[in-house]
Every structure is written in structure tokens, then in C-alpha cells.
Amino acid sequence: MQQNIWFTPEGIEDLLPEEAKKLEFYRRQLLDGFELSGYDLVLPPIAEFTDSLLTGKGRHLAVDTCRFTDQESGKMMGVRADMTPQVARIATNRIKQTGIQRLCYVGEVLKTRNNKAKGSRSPIEIGAELFGHSGVESDIEVIELMVSSLHNIGLQDLTLSLGHVSVVDELMNVSGLTPTQKENLVDILLRKAVPEYTDFVAELTVTEAQKQAFELLLSLCGDIATVTEAMQGLAGLSEPMQRHLAHLQSVVDHFAGFDGLKIHMDLADLRGYQYHTGMIFSCYAAGRKMYQLARGGRYDGIGSEFGSAQLATGFSLDLRGALDLLTSPAEAEKEIVYAPNVYDADLQAEIAKLKQQKTIIKRFYEFDALEKGSRYLALQASQWILSVK
């Protein structure tokens, strides 16, 4: 019974030395790659007042946010469940830079619920966000950074999944759906409930062209030829629809020639509908039952609650969740030298010199505890020299 106090909550795990070393290696690899692409590192706090943490586009995180009362102010605080709203707050309220901003971030987040399909309740989130540009060029830049970052940490066999939530949004608008009908349709598409969708479309009072567009929607799922089908079946509905599909076509054209990158499309995918405003994208590891490695999308308008709505696109990945797919970094075995636990200025100088040479220094308390063959620092003729037991 007593041992139960050592158990961690469901979905919250320790990282032991080998895993922690591996995670830190790849964290550094990713951040270095972001920096070389012009993205500046920011580190938001682990907790904030819920007034800012769960406002605007962050409202959808309320059910996943662990909350508590701040003993200093009496106000409600929350532990972040996603870092993107925090980064948007920093970009809007703290940096206040005009033009394009590129920011990256890393940190642990905490969720109230354990979703086994998505892994840990305490992911280590790392990502990059681009603020201040609305064109297809910034979407392409962010997707390219996502793909190249995964390649740089050794994940080569990738599937890039693309969608655009504005396609469904515009179809609902041109068809004159009521707010209730829109809400019902979004719910049906999120659940992938095909029979319900068929019944819903059959009951719509819309033009024949609009009904055909709704009937076509679920079939717009597959390879890059999907965009051509969508252009033929949907582009004529409105000018905004044509723009959304042309935007998608530009992204597909850019990535179609990437070696080892498969492209999958699903124009009925509404993941993050309450949050995203345009392109949505994700990367999957093909050899792991289509495990989602990274995801992102456009979320224009974020930051309006802080006084300045931002054009924004970005992506993030759970580094802890990806550990099993990453190989342990190959590194030269470091030399270990043992040093006695005494204070001596000359000894400290010798230790500092060895550490500069990347030698690991471990203190020993009893000489007899050292194994035979161990290297250690010994005081001989008033000098600290390396000896072997």
C-alpha cells in the first residue's frame, strides 16, 4: 500500500538519464535549426492568469487547463496546456515589433486529461511561429521549416497532410447555412460520421450546384490530384473559394518535388476549426501507424484580445512523444576521472582544466570504493596528477 505514493499520475512520466540525454540532444538540434532560419527564442512562464491564458483563441484550451488560485493576488491562474497563445501574447504585447516576427519556443505543458491516442499529459512542446504575413509564402516557409526540422533529427520517411478549413467555411457561407446548421455540420465532419453527413446534405435546401459541392466534399481526400478535383468541383462557387484553392495549389506545387515526402490531402478535415483560419498541416511518420509528429496551421486574428490582432502561422511538435522514433545520439565515450572531496585551490584548478577538455569529474568519498583501473586525481609532491588505481 505504501509504495503507491511513488506512482505518478496517469499520463505523466519521468524521463530517466538516457531518455533525458536523448531529449536534450534533439531539443538543442531543433532550436539550433530554428535559430539558423531566423527564429528568435522566447520562454513564456509555466503558469499565467487565466484572464490572459484562456482568452480569445485560447478559450478552446479551458477544458485541458489545470487551474489554481494565486495565493498572492487571489486571482485564478492556469498551467499552460499549449504554448502558442503565450507566444502570441509575447509577440503582440511585449515585443510589439512592426512587420514580420519569427519566434520559436520550447517548454513543458500540462493537460488535465490523458488522451492515450495523443500520448503524454505533460508533452514537451517545441515549435515556431511566424507573425505579420498573410500570404502563401509564409505558410510555405513554416511548412518547409517543419519538414526540414524533422529531417534534421533523422526522421526521413514522412507524410505531409494538408487541408484548408476555409474551404468548408466558404461552402457553408455561399450555401446560406444558418449558425445552427453550420454548428451541426462541423460536428459531423469532426466525428467523420459519413451516414449522418449524407442525411444532413439530403435535407439541405440549396441549389443543385451547392448540393453537388457538398456531395463532392467527402471524396476530396487523397493525393495531390485532390486539388485538381476540388478546383473543378468547387472553384466556381465563389471568388473566395477560388482563392482558397489556389492557395492550396501553390503549397502542393511547392512540396510535390520534395524527395521522400508523400503528400496527403483532406479538404473535409476541420481539426482545430475553432482556432485555425486557413491552411492546416501536419507531418506523420509512415512506419509508425501514421504517428503524428508535428502539426500546425494558420490562425490569423490571434492577439486581438491584447490590443493588436496578428496574422499568424506556425507549428509545434511533442518532443517527448517523438523520443521512441529517434535514435540515441552517437557520441564519443567521455573519460571519467575521480577527484577527492576536499577543497584545495590547485585541485579546483586541475578539475576546471579537465572539464574544459570535456572530461567527466566525479567526486569520491572513500578511496577503497573506487574500482580497479579507475583514473583519479592524487596529490603527489604537492601536485595533483592523474593516477590509476
UniProtKB/Swiss-Prot annotation:
User: Which family, according to the similarity comment?
Assistant: Belongs to the class-II aminoacyl-tRNA synthetase family. HisZ subfamily.
The set of disulfide-linked cysteines is none
Where found?
A: Cytoplasm
Q: What does this protein do?
A: Required for the first step of histidine biosynthesis. May allow the feedback regulation of ATP phosphoribosyltransferase activity by histidine.
**UniProt source species:** Hydrogenovibrio crunogenus (strain DSM 25203 / XCL-2)
Q: In which pathway does it act?
A: Amino-acid biosynthesis; L-histidine biosynthesis; L-histidine from 5-phospho-alpha-D-ribose 1-diphosphate: step 1/9
* InterPro entries the UniProt entry points to: aa-tRNA-synth_II/BPL/LPL, HisRS-like_core, HisRS/HisZ, HisZ
A GO biological process of this protein is: L-histidine biosynthetic process
Q: What else is known?
A: This function is generally fulfilled by the C-terminal part of HisG, which is missing in some bacteria such as this one.
Name the Gene Ontology molecular function terms of this record.
histidine-tRNA ligase activity
Record text on subunit structure and interactions: Heteromultimer composed of HisG and HisZ subunits.
Q: Which SUPFAM superfamilies match?
A: Class II aaRS and biotin synthetases
Task: Identify this protein by name.
Answer: ATP phosphoribosyltransferase regulatory subunit
Which Pfam family, just one, is annotated for this protein?
A: tRNA-synt_His
| Cellular component, GO, one term | cytoplasm
Alphabetical UniProt keywords: Amino-acid biosynthesis, Cytoplasm, Histidine biosynthesis
